[in-house]
């Protein structure tokens, strides 16, 4: 049941990386506050499980598989949102990749590309597509999950820390340019959290 202060009844929310961990909890919280949540992650079975749990608890949710490191997946996701709902009120960019743990000098191109594709390019174009829908319907909110590593890089987490620092600055760029459109953009910087990365 939604509380008056954070009543999101009638709002359409998208959460990426929502099949477990922080994203799953954000999706459940938004649903408890009344939003209809599009539960998105790479694997449809995992998305479906979270969406079913939300529905069992009385909330509204729909699963939709999307790898935010894949531009075609992002295009398909937003085409679906436009067709099914016609608008988007909340976008939580939470999907992340951290495939490499080791010295920065030993980072290989594959790990570099995967981390950048998801954590920077994915967040950027998810925000662009969300922002276009929000701009056309009076505004909305974009929330990016960064990391405390954006401010203080963790040991042996070089490329991950670099991408999360980029997310913080990206959020500032979108906040400044999209504020006149009624779109708020903010970042979360969680510390170490027990979860699994792709």
Regions found by a protein language model. Name each.
Residues 44, 65-77, 109:
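The beta1-alpha1 cofactor-binding region of Rossmann-like NAD(H)/NADP(H)-dependent oxidoreductases
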Residues 12, 19-20:
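Conserved glycine-rich cofactor-binding loop
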Residues 127, 163, 171:
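Active-site helix of classical SDR
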Residues 102-104, 108-113, 142:
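Substrate-binding pocket helix/loop in short-chain dehydrogenase/reductase
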Residues 147:
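Residue(s) in the substrate-gating loop at a strand-loop-helix junction
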Residues 107, 153-161, 173:
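Active-site loop-to-helix junction immediately N-terminal to the catalytic Tyr of the SDR YXXXK motif
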Residues 132, 176-180:
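Alpha-helical segment proximal to the catalytic Tyr-Lys
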């Amino acid at each position: 049941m939604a509380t008056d202060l954070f009543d999101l009844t009638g709002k359409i929310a998208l959460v990426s990386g929502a099949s477990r961990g922080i994203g799953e909890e954000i999706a459940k919280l938004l649903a408890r506050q009344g939003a209809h949540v599009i539960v998105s992650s790479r694997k449809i079975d995992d998305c479906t499980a979270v969406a079913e749990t939300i529905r069992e608890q009385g909330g509204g949710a729909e699963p939709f598989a999307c790898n935010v490191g894949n531009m075609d997946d992002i295009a398909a996701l937003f085409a679906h949102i436009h067709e099914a709902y016609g608008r988007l009120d909340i976008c939580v960019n939470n999907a992340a990749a951290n495939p490499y743990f080791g010295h920065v000098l030993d980072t290989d191109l594959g790990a570099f590309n995967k981390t950048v594709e998801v954590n920077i390019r994915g967040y950027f174009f998810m925000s662009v597509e969300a922002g276009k829908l929000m701009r056309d319907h009076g505004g909305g909110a974009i929330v990016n999950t960064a990391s405390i590593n954006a401010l203080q890089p963790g040991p042996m987490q070089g490329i991950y820390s670099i991408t999360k620092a980029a997310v913080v600055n990206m959020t500032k760029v979108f906040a400044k340019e999209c504020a006149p459109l009624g779109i708020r953009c903010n970042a979360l910087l969680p510390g170490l959290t027990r979860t699994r990365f792709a």
